[in-house]
């Protein structure tokens, strides 16, 4: 069962009545309560809807139960605001008495709630939030990330841009907060180590309405622009890029969230040819994704997105972990360690397993926006298999460097 609050009403998922001795014991222990928070209002509302829908699709397919216990999902709207996210997590834990919490979009929210779940020893899953240091320099024992670290997909793009796209002089224009910094920083580091130069770095506020001043200030001697955007900002920036005449003159590449399916549907021909990197594409050609994408579109009448598949995967992690401990989620440490041990060979995203710090090792896909059958899609043009959050670097040496931020790596070629 999924319970929403406020205007979101009550949504029921299919629940099968378990039978047999194991089911009876599960019933005696009561339902497993999962607190799920997502931005169901504000600029990232569509993202939040995709998250909830992907999460609930898995539980519907699983019959609303695992290990003989029913699963109850309690949903909260955190409005895409980090402080609100912390408030909602506290409510889920202290009022709703959930066994575990999951959700969130913005990396800043991930950093905001981490101290609370750590202090209160709450098994927590980050299906989407990508703050690097949650699984790097400041690992949080009680958090398992089933998504990816913010720079995990941009390291490969730095390699691809130089070696395969032939780009040499780049600028960046990204959202001015931790995900933008970390994602762009990963790209810059690998691109420059490959021999390229980032000659300008621009940052835009999350409430930006007019990209004109930023685009007008772009250097004229660049052959490409790297951008990190998400949500409604992606559509706003893509239109501005075309309106200012850059399309076809300067290569546009970036984080996969920039052309994710949940925003791509609102774009037009201005998006054609844009190359991005991500852990997923709705048109990935593997049996698990074909099943998932078809089921998602059939149920919700829209294409699967990064956020829907990430949440679907998170639910799968819960299912496998809870099954492995025979439903004993009351033993929090056992539950947490079971989550960390999950390996999935047939996820829609491809094979996944956790590293020692609780972050997936998984494929990163280079995608190009094309129109196929009258519909825009992220066609996979290259695959980097089994990518670690540390790329090809030695883990211990990598962790000695500073966290990617607004000023690191420094812009050595800016003048």
Where are the predicted features?
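Hydrophobic h-region of N-terminal signal peptides that target proteins for export
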Residues: 14-22
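Extracytosolic ligand-binding ectodomains
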Residues: 3, 8-13, 25-415
């Amino acid at each position: 069962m999924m319970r929403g609050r406020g205007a979101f009403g009550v949504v029921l998922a299919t629940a099968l009545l378990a039978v047999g001795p194991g089911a009876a014991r599960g019933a005696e222990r009561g339902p497993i309560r999962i607190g799920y928070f997502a931005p169901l209002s504000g600029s990232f509302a569509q993202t939040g809807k995709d998250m909830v829908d992907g999460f609930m699709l898995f539980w519907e397919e699983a019959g609303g139960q695992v290990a003989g216990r029913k699963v109850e999902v309690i949903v909260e709207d955190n409005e895409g605001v980090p402080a609100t996210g912390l408030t909602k997590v506290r409510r889920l834990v202290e009022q709703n008495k959930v066994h575990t919490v999951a959700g969130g979009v913005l990396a800043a929210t991930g950093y905001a709630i981490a101290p609370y779940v750590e202090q209160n020893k709450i098994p927590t899953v980050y299906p989407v939030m990508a703050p690097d240091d949650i699984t790097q320099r400041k690992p949080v024992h009680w958090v398992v990330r089933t998504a990816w670290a913010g720079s995990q997909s941009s390291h490969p793009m730095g390699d691809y841009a130089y070696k395969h796209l032939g780009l040499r002089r780049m600028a960046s224009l990204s959202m001015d907060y931790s995900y933008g910094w970390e994602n762009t920083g990963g790209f810059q580091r690998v691109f420059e180590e490959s021999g390229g130069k980032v000659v300008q770095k621009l940052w835009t506020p999350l409430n930006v309405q007019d990209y004109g001043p930023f685009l007008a200030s772009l250097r004229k001697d660049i052959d490409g622009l790297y951008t990190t955007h998400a949500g409604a900002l992606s559509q706003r920036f893509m239109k501005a890029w075309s309106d200012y005449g850059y399309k076809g003159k300067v290569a546009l590449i970036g984080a996969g969230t920039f052309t994710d399916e949940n925003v791509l549907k609102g774009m037009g021909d201005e998006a054609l040819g844009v190359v991005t990197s991500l852990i997923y594409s709705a048109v990935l050609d593997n049996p698990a994704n074909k099943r998932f994408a078809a089921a998602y579109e059939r149920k919700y009448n829209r294409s699967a997105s990064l956020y829907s598949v990430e949440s679907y995967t998170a639910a799968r992690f819960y299912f496998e972990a809870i099954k492995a401990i025979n439903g004993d989620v009351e033993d929090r440490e056992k539950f947490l360690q079971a989550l960390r041990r999950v390996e999935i060979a047939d996820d829609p995203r491809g094979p996944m397993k956790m590293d020692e710090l609780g972050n997936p090792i998984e494929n990163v896909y280079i995608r190009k926006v094309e129109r196929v059958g009258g519909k825009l899609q992220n066609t996979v043009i290259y695959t980097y298999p089994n990518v670690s959050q540390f790329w090809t670097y030695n883990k211990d040496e990598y962790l000695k460097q500073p966290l990617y931020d607004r000023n690191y790596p420094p812009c050595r070629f800016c003048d």
